[in-house]
């Protein structure tokens, strides 16, 4: 009850003070103009930008996958998927928001997002120097908004492709009330059947992913909107690692059944109040239960459970001339439990060789309870008709590390000409340390939050009604990052310290054409450099996600009312990697060999390039709207190398061993089908 009281006290102060402040300002005006009407409109259609993202070729209708066609965004795991890395930051540095609420589970293990494409209303990517409404992030922010349900006769939409199938049910219930519910399930298990064996690996639990989203919304009168939400997703799979496999030959500790089972389930409620045309108040609350279980080797396992509660309060007003004021309060509460019987490896994504950081097998149970509080204010101030300034501040505190931050943030936009604007943005940021580094038994409970400072500047030019271009430069200074302590050092018991820093800098250019003459598209190019510095040795090395240049091109053409075609081309410099320059006996299994690595991230993979093409045919089946989508992934069949690894065959010696390349996805045809009843 004490925590609940503390939670609502700042909220009451925010709402009451802003209401009083706005009333006093408005009372000074001589003339009062009030627009009477329904202010709680349901937002049921996607934005134009989202529709364009959904049409990008080769993404199976997944608009979040389309963000990898934007400047400065790459997959952390190459063609194998993984979360996005933005402008030289770690994927863990990003924050994801869905309908204003923070979430961690937004991509499946194979890289596709957890959202039904028919439910997305808007996607915003803030790649750097984002505003005060976002916190607990030092990289970038993905803000995803799902659309509201449609008050219509009951409708069922079914879609299927070679990769997944799904169903969406939507319609009105009572007056001013409507709902939708979506469920999707992957079809990967049809291509990777149980019992299939290759190179000593046998599938015993074919990989499956599924997800669901649901909303029930009640428009109360003209000024209130009450929305209940359900969200969830899961991924699972299992494989047997035998002595004959490469993994088994390298490290027999992994011989046996290996499986993963991860899921999350979320329930939430949001109340929006529009008491006046200039005022909006929002209260959002949700509960998220995230669970993960990994089993491998001879009885080794790692299980985790995160019981999370989120509360967000927001008040906004435009009653003060030339100002849009926002005040908000956030509370994020975590109860994280980690159970394990495993051989730990104490390393980070900037360690040269995790094998050298191998610890002794340990069993135990660890727990982290953390409450993260934030209070923020923001003012968008129209200084002149051509000059806009945004000033914000965000105060954050967490009761685990006991750290408090005050983060100032600002931006300035100047319209030099009606079609040309210059802008600059800056801010400071922090995030809670990685859980693995903060655990008391396997990490350092005294590890501190990671910090960053962002600055960016650029220009936008509306060339014509249909053509526009944008250029931007940026710099990210990263500090207090986690550094793995050498297990042979005198302070090895610390495991991790805040002795790593880094920088990421670059320039990006985008030219975009809006729909005209039956086609639209964009071309982007970027140059960047991302480095990390060991603050103890003062050695600076390139970050493994450092991608000096990236080029993306997207185009879609409407042939007629039935046919659309599109293409996406991506090319980029290869990722950094640490080369293997030899092998050595495994100290725990002398008859087996481990790879011996050279200088950290000192080599570069070959250039990556990929062309995806797609055609969509719209028609009717017995009066019902339907569509067929034909796609060809990696149409040119480029052999994109994603890494190199030591491939033992049982006959290797230190003078005779095989290093093999790992390739990304080859030519892959796909077909999709969608029908609405």
Residue ranges: model-predicted function:
Residues 562, 571-591, 608-612, 616-677:
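C-terminal beta-signal and adjacent terminal beta-strands/loops
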Residues 382-386, 475-477, 498-581, 674:
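Gram-negative outer-membrane beta-barrel transporters
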Residues 340-354, 399, 414, 418-456, ...:
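Surface-exposed extracellular loop regions of Gram-negative outer-membrane beta-barrel proteins
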Residues 40-117, 122-130, 147:
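Periplasmic N-terminal accessory/gating domains of Gram-negative outer-membrane beta-barrel systems
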Residues 110-113, 121-132, 140-171, 181-183, ...:
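Short strand-turn segments of transmembrane beta-barrel domains in outer membranes
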Residues 161-185, 200-237, 259-283, 317-320, ...:
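Transmembrane beta-barrel wall of Gram-negative outer-membrane proteins
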Residues 231, 320-324, 330, 363-478, ...:
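Structural signature of Gram-negative outer-membrane beta-barrels, strongest in the C-terminal barrel
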Residues 282-286, 292, 415, 422-423, ...:
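Membrane-embedded beta-barrel scaffold of Gram-negative outer-membrane proteins
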